[in-house]
From Swiss-Prot:
HAMAP family: His_tRNA_synth (MF_00127). The keyword Protein biosynthesis applies. SUPFAM superfamilies: Class II aaRS ABD-related (SSF52954), Class II aaRS and biotin synthetases (SSF55681). The lineage of its organism: Bacteria, Pseudomonadati, Pseudomonadota, Gammaproteobacteria, Methylococcales. PANTHER family: HISTIDINE--TRNA LIGASE, MITOCHONDRIAL-RELATED, HISTIDYL-TRNA SYNTHETASE. Gene3D superfamilies: Anticodon-binding domain (3.40.50.800), Bira Bifunctional Protein, Domain 2 (3.30.930.10). This is Histidine--tRNA ligase. The keyword Protein transport does not apply. InterPro entries: aa-tRNA-synth_II, aa-tRNA-synth_II/BPL/LPL, Anticodon-bd, Anticodon-bd_dom_sf, His-tRNA-ligase, HisRS-like_core, HisRS/HisZ, HisRS_anticodon. Its EC number is 6.1.1.21. Signal peptide: none annotated. Its main location: cytoplasm. It comes from Methylococcus capsulatus (strain ATCC 33009 / NCIMB 11132 / Bath). GO terms for molecular function: ATP binding; histidine-tRNA ligase activity.
Amino acid sequence: MSEKIQAIRGMHDILPDMTPRWQQVEHQIRSVMANYGYREIRLPIVEKTELFKRSIGEVTDIVEKEMYVFEDRNGDSLTLRPEGTAGCLRACLEHGLLHNQTHRLWYAGPMFRHERPQKGRYRQFHQVGVEVFGMPGPDIDAELIFLSRRLWQRLGVAHKLRLELNSLGTPDERLAYRQILVDYLRENYDALDADSARRLETNPLRILDSKNPAMKDLLAGAPVLADHLGGASRAHFEGLTELLDAAEIPYVINPRLVRGLDYYCNTVFEWVTDELGTQGTVCAGGRYDGLVAQLGGRDSSAIGFALGMERLIELTGETFAENAPHIYFITVGTAAERRGAVLAEMLRDAFPSLRLVVNCGGGSFKNQFKRADKSAAAFALVLGEDEMRDDSISLKPLRSDDAQQTVAQADLVRLIQSCVPI
């Protein structure tokens, strides 16, 4: 026997017993996006490597260590997308969507990063992204938070998540603060761990986000970015917090929240939980006003967020039940199988939401009832030799002690209507 081929490490299968939970979460996402007037955009999984180098930054961990990069037959360097913002913006610029226009967009799909797999972190993972272009004020920042909070409420997880905020200011303000932070960290170089020492030369603001407990005291004494913001940046952030206060949305201002991508400015935010171990960030985003020009467009304001589907679905737990069949249709004998196929299609016409599984492959009554029970269906619809002879059909409850009912086949629709909650 040949050796079985396994899935690539860090790339997981979503099996049929889990897909109902995914589908139900996806349904709520689509519903909330429609509530707020956001339109879906569908994007390629593969983009030119240069897109991510220019947008994410060449000295970030993602570009340096985590991207799946390959050459096609023409020698072009291509990359499996590690995030969605750059591809969404590329599509908007390529198709002229941003010319004197505002847009509220969303997308969903797999992303790829060559990280060390662990609980809640995969090399292929799924994100839902939201991007807004052409709206510079704090009101749209607040709308994204309102939208995400409404999704948590729909999914029954709002009580498990808390909102953390910060402002990174303008690129110039952040650059000036960067030097102040670097000076402080160099004075305390011996206290840096190996990862922070490396980041000191490449992306020092990411040191503020260190999860190493040994760095806690050092970072507690570090200069705070908020103390180095200009008046316009302060006013923008205050405008956001005032809107959140008015909507009675609780939040924590976290001066160490910096985000992992170079293109962020002004507002940044995360929805975090304590219920998923170290992988506590479920949703994160912020402003990236300079990225449009960086990728060849005109200067334009932009803001967005991404949420991790795997983490969100784990957080929902058993909030959503599996979509088990309403009915398992048992047919015994060739004539019953033929008649059953016709009746099944009639029921699907009459009840578009009906989940009906028809037994295929034959089998005795006993074996078919075992399959019906294993399917978790609520009812068994039975069509055997006796029913064929009498032109009748029987409905047997499988999850209660209610009595089996037998009616004429002509009355089947009325029977289903009265007995099966669809």
